[in-house]
Regions:
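Extended, histidine- and acidic-residue-enriched regions that form the cofactor-binding/catalytic faces
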Residues: 2-220
Length: 220
């Protein structure tokens, strides 16, 4: 007999910092003093995709991980470090590497003072200066873990050696699965598909879960 949907256990929700009261935040951190901080970008990834494609992807992964593990999830930093935009793609915007680095340092320093002992910084943008700005964030004692979602091996799913070699196609498939209403026809015509997007998303989520949230914490 199939379970009654009305009696099924409710699906866990992400622990969204901006929607929680101070008491709820304190209770969450007392149970698990970690914080997920997604870092996005506003840039052209494909002519048929929204400018915030990388942010949309990292938002979905952050929400899923927060819900699965009950870890506090900070509001997304929407801007990152991008290459200089081509003129035909207006509104691409970039922070300087130093600016992003300083902003993240200020954020984690403040949160560390409130008892957070591990930061999980997620991004879906593999531009080297962007990753350098994130990976050099420092703390006094808290652990900082930086995750480039596209560093996960996806070659067997995409047919290319590195995700960055077909970044537009990877984003297109992911968004066809996650937010199909935001994908224009020209992105679908590139060979991207929701089926591939689901496989990519599940691979990324599983690998991050295994390596960051399920792996034993190394002894100091």
């Amino acid at each position: 007999m199939s379970p009654d949907p009305q009696n099924a256990d409710p699906k866990p929700l992400p622990q969204l910092l901006k929607q929680m009261t101070p008491g709820e935040v304190a209770e969450t951190l007392a149970r698990d003093p970690r914080l997920i901080l997604p870092v996005g970008t506003i840039e052209k990834t494909h002519p048929g995709l929204p400018m915030g494609a990388s942010t949309i992807v990292v938002d979905h992964v952050a929400d899923a991980l927060s819900a699965e593990f009950g870890v506090l999830r900070a509001p997304t930093v929407e801007y990152g470090v991008n290459a200089v935009s081509e003129p035909e793609y207006p509104a691409s915007v970039t922070l300087r590497k130093k600016t992003l680095h300083r902003m993240l340092n200020d954020l984690v320093t403040t949160w560390e003072c409130h008892g957070i002992n591990e930061f999980v910084l997620l991004t879906a943008h593999g531009y080297d200066p962007h990753l350098e700005a994130i990976s050099t964030v420092g703390t006094v004692r808290a652990r900082v873990r930086v995750v480039d979602l596209f560093a996960v091996n996806l070659s067997d799913l995409t047919g290319v050696r590195r995700s960055e070699d077909d970044r537009g196609g990877v984003y297109a498939s992911l968004l066809l699965y996650l937010t199909p209403s935001l994908v224009h026809a020209e992105a679908s015509d590139s060979g991207a598909s929701a089926e591939q997007g689901r496989a990519l998303y599940e691979r990324i989520r599983a690998r991050v879960s295994e390596r960051i949230f399920l792996a034993p914490v190394p002894s100091e």
